[in-house]
Design a protein with these regions (language model features):
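P-loop NTPase catalytic core of nucleic-acid-dependent motor ATPases
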Residues: 48-167, 175-176, 226, 230
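Switch/connector loops and helix/strand junctions flanking conserved nucleotide-binding motifs
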Residues: 123-124, 170-173, 214-220, 234-239
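Conserved catalytic/switch belt of AAA+ P-loop NTPases
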Residues: 136, 175-198
Length: 252
């Protein structure tokens, strides 16, 4: 479902008042006809429960955006290993494990956000956008911290992977608390404009990229963030990054 809209009974009838159905004395509006229909679909509420059946509730899970098939993504993998992780096997193994867990265990969160810190044009966005494309509508890219920690956050209700591109936290303690809760808490409060707050199960995995030296509120004992200092060996190499995208768009 691309989006969910809430309407009162009166608003529903008014919205479809110009869509008549039936004939003669049975002629009525589409809204009234649907409300009176014995076979109409109705739910106790909405949930986001990846890979689960939740009787009586509308599950917003739409699965993956792609079907698995054999292909060649060697350029992408090489980029992650040698540029993102600077050929550090321990770092690349952890990052690949984190990414694999996003796919294999969608309903579980590791409680760790991945932070890519490095200069512009080093390929941070290539990693995040290509990986996020696996999840379709359950992936979102945001560019401001307020999109994650602000009051109106209905865009997060059905998200598995959130990519915060060049978003950083400048000492805002309230936003810091919201951010850390998003990484570790089992539920998330979703607020839509003009509607009551709804509690959803939290399935968000957070990816952050920035060229700022101070990106996230992580102290010496912080364990919520896995910070990677990205290499710049391919900085602004359009041919190299274009080759990665071309391979991924050709079955990679």
């Amino acid at each position: 479902y691309a989006d969910i809209t809430f309407s009162s009974q009166a608003d529903l009838i008014a919205r479809y008042s110009n869509c008549p159905v039936g004939r003669g004395q049975k002629r009525t509006s589409a809204g009234k006809a649907w409300l009176a229909h014995t076979d109409r679909r109705q739910y106790e509420g909405i949930v986001f429960a990846p890979g689960e059946e939740v009787p009586g509730y509308l599950n917003l899970d739409r699965g993956f955006a792609v079907e698995p098939k054999k292909g060649d993504c060697s350029r992408f993998l090489e980029h992650v290993r040698n540029n993102i992780c600077k050929a550090d096997e321990e770092i690349s193994d952890y990052l690949f494990t984190w990414m694999a867990d996003c796919v294999q265990n969608r309903s579980r969160r590791p409680g760790i956000a991945v932070v890519l810190r490095g200069r512009q044009g080093t390929g941070k966005g290539i990693l995040c956008s290509q990986f996020g494309s696996l999840f379709g509508q359950h992936f979102i890219q945001v560019s401001q911290a307020s999109h994650l920690t602000g009051n109106f956050n209905s865009h997060l209700k059905d998200k598995l992977v959130v990519y915060a591109d060049e978003a950083f936290w400048a000492g805002d303690k309230k936003a810091e608390g919201v951010l850390k809760a998003m990484i570790t808490e089992d539920t998330i409060q979703i607020e839509m404009k003009g509607k009551d707050v709804i509690t959803f199960r939290n399935h968000i995995r957070l990816l952050v990229s920035s060229n700022h030296s101070w990106v996230v509120p992580a102290g010496n004992e912080e364990r919520r963030f896995f910070v990677i200092d990205v290499g710049d060996g391919r900085i602004q190499d359009r041919s190299y990054f274009g080759g990665i995208v071309s391979q991924m768009n050709s079955g990679g």
